[in-house]
From Swiss-Prot:
Protein name, as recorded: tRNA-guanine(15) transglycosylase
Catalysed reaction, written as an equation: guanosine(15) in tRNA + 7-cyano-7-deazaguanine = 7-cyano-7-carbaguanosine(15) in tRNA + guanine
Cofactor(s), names only, from the UniProt record: Zn(2+)
The protein's annotated pathway: tRNA modification; archaeosine-tRNA biosynthesis
Gene3D superfamilies for this protein: Queuine tRNA-ribosyltransferase-like (3.20.20.105)
Biological role: Exchanges the guanine residue with 7-cyano-7-deazaguanine (preQ0) at position 15 in the dihydrouridine loop (D-loop) of archaeal tRNAs.
Cofactor binding: number and manner: Binds 1 zinc ion per subunit.
Signal peptide region: none
GO molecular function: pentosyltransferase activity; zinc ion binding
């Protein structure tokens, strides 16, 4: 492995860590801005100044001007000295069904231009039959083995298989045997585009909780502020987003809890400009793109702070109440993945639990604590409810904590 991954803090199955590669470091969870190498709504220098020291661009698009890129090298070509990851063209394969490049060619090209992290030409299987997805997975695994023999960059090990969980687990089993640097879960974008977040949680939630913690996990195509906290809590470390730029072209404004159209806003500020003022400005696409990327940066940085404070579940549940698709995805996770989640939970935490209704009562850390409480002699319970975590620190306003917890002990 070329990457060194060190975990510093944990909460739920989420973790704050550091990835070190080629003398460069990123702190996880981390979001890679997706860069169009030939047309940038937001210049790369500004992205760097905003605190992003790793980006993703597309090797398949770069290949169309391969002589120039190979001559300069990817870092000089883009003017970026941080970690550069290249995607292989798998997204274009998902969109268009076919691309005019072979796996061997894209691996060789990524070697020649000097990427830090690279990808194989894996095959997404969204919308395919089980047998088709199985065949695609076999090809993907063969391509990965070929790439490992060729690549001089840190390599992602793709875990494909679409909705077929046994295929996803087969991919994980095979990929974990190989000398890869990052577990990369693909085939996510179609679910994101259709807001099928509960379906996504059912497909990749169990998988995330079973992935070994020795290497970071990248959820390709997932990078919305409303959704990231839940999947961090399940164990994801890396995300990426082109939405900051794509949304800007459509005059869509990212916020931590939902996306708005510029035409529907009046008094809200986007950077230093009122929405009513921004509507008539020539450079509004640039301003919105910068605003959107700042929202994403602040979100991922805030998530890291919440993990350090042991408040990640509080935030996941706050987010769940912002949209039905997130609510039911969160409820599914808490109801059905408890046995896996509790294996990752810290035994005690620095802060109390914020009561927010039924989802709070389903939290894996609280359920585990109640399980342990039930094993005690009744004479010990009152003292435990007064002082022990999480009961003594439970944040429930003016309600009587003992009466609240007694109903769980019947």
């Amino acid at each position: 492995m070329k990457i060194k991954f060190e975990i510093k803090y944990k909460d739920a199955a989420g973790k704050v860590g550091k990835i070190k590669l080629n003398g460069k470091t990123i702190e996880t969870p981390y979001l890679f801005p997706v860069i169009n190498p030939f047309k940038q709504e937001l210049p790369i220098k500004e992205i760097k100044k905003m605190g992003f020291n790793a980006i993703i661009t597309n090797a398949y698009i770069l290949f169309k001007r391969k002589e120039e890129v190979m001559e300069k090298g990817i870092h000089n070509f883009l003017g970026f000295d941080g970690i550069i990851e290249t995607d292989s063209g798998a997204y274009q394969l998902l969109q268009y069904g076919d691309i005019d490049i072979e796996n061997e060619d894209i691996i060789y090209f990524q070697n020649e231009i000097g990427v830090d992290i690279g990808n194989i030409l894996d095959i997404p299987s969204y919308g395919k039959t089980y047998e088709e997805a199985k065949k695609d997975l076999e090809i993907t695994l063969e391509r990965l083995k070929q790439a490992i023999e060729m690549a001089n960059f840190a390599i992602n090990g793709p875990i494909q298989g679409d909705k077929y969980l046994d295929l996803r687990y087969k991919a994980l089993e095979e990929v974990s045997k190989l000398d890869i640097d990052i577990y990369a879960i693909g085939g996510i974008v179609p679910y994101m585009n259709q807001y099928k977040i509960e379906s996504l949680a059912k497909i990749i939630g169990p998988l995330l909780l079973d992935i070994p913690r020795d290497r970071p996990v990248h959820l390709f195509g997932l990078g919305h502020p409303l959704i990231m906290p839940l999947f961090v809590a399940l164990g994801a470390d890396l995300f990426d987003s082109a939405s900051y730029s794509l949304f800007a072209k459509e005059e869509r404004i990212l916020t931590p809890f939902r996306t708005f159209r510029l035409e529907d806003l009046t008094d809200s500020y986007i950077l230093d400009y009122k929405a009513s003022e921004l509507k008539g400005m020539e450079n509004k696409t640039y301003i919105i793109a910068k605003h959107n990327l700042l929202v994403l940066r602040n979100e991922i940085n805030f998530i890291r702070d919440l993990i350090r404070q042991n408040r990640l579940w509080d935030y996941v549940i706050i987010k769940a109440h912002a949209h039905p698709s997130i609510y039911f995805a969160t409820k599914y996770v808490l109801e059905n993945l408890y046995e896996k989640l509790k294996e990752h939970e810290p035994i005690t935490k620095r802060v109390g639990i914020l009561y927010q209704g039924e989802l709070t009562e389903l939290r894996s850390d609280l359920r585990y604590a109640i399980e342990q409480l039930k094993k005690l002699d009744k004479s010990q319970i009152n003292d435990i409810l007064d002082y022990a975590w999480p009961f003594g620190q439970f944040e429930i306003g003016e309600k009587d904590k003992k009466l609240f917890f007694q109903r769980f002990l019947k």
